[in-house]
Amino acid sequence: MRHFIIVKLKDSSKRRELIAPITELFSASYEIDGVSQVSVHECCTPFENRYDIMIEMVMEERALPVYNDSEMHRTWKRVYGELIEKKAIFGAET
């Protein structure tokens, strides 16, 4: 499955500086059995009404609850949650 986390930051001007630390944090998800790919994308359009960052994960369906309960996921919420205005979570079959 593909798991997408699409984020609109409270301050979009910070998105570029957040890409590297978010990528580093999410690289820990490779330690979860069944996660095969993780990529972090920065929005490339300058419009204010766009989301800023998209995190894409490819995983086996059984890995999703493990990811949700992981320390990495808790760190994501704790460290970056206050910077997020809104987010969309989307799952798709591969």
Where are the predicted features?
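Short, well-ordered beta-strand segments in beta-rich or mixed alpha/beta enzyme
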Residues: 2-8, 41-70
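Non-catalytic alpha-helical scaffold/packing segments enriched in small hydrophobic residues
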Residues: 4, 21-24
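Compositionally biased, intrinsically disordered low-complexity regions
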Residues: 7, 12-15, 29, 38
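Residues that form or flank phosphate/diphosphate-binding pockets in enzymes
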Residues: 13-17, 49, 75
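Short, conserved charged micro-motifs
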Residues: 13-19, 63-67
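A generic local structural motif
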Residues: 23-26, 41-43
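An amphipathic, aromatic/His-enriched active-site/gating alpha helix that lines ligand/cofactor pockets
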Residues: 24, 30-34, 58-90
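Glycine-rich beta-strand-turn "strand-cap" elements at beta-sheet edges
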Residues: 39-51, 77-94
